[in-house]
A protein has these predicted regions:
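Ribonuclease/tRNase effector modules and their secretory precursors
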Residues: 1-95
């Protein structure tokens, strides 16, 4: 079973800035067609990943996260609605 964690202050600011709660963001990990990418540009102190998929509110989101070594824990760092290019990629239209 996957466990999720996040900083509550960051979750509040993310909701204000992007209109996406981390509760909604975690549902993206259950989209069977979600695509995960390694986020090389932001993986300085830890490996970060981007998950692109549909939430349980039928919104296509991109979720930045890292995976904790202790247990099966995903730490959500940020989440936002996917851009037009990201949407095309998810739909198989883009590069």
């Amino acid at each position: 079973m996957i466990k999720f964690e996040w900083d509550t202050t960051k979750a509040t600011s993310n909701k204000k800035k992007h209109g996406v709660s981390f509760d909604e963001a975690r549902s993206v990990f259950y989209d069977e067609f979600a695509v995960q990418f390694f986020d090389e540009d932001n993986s300085v102190s830890e490996n970060r990943f981007l998950m692109l998929g549909f939430s349980d509110e039928a919104r296509l989101l991109i979720v930045c996260h890292c995976e904790r070594e202790e247990g099966n824990i995903i730490r959500i760092l940020s989440a936002r609605k996917a851009t037009k290019n990201e949407s095309h990629y998810y739909q198989g239209i883009g590069p």
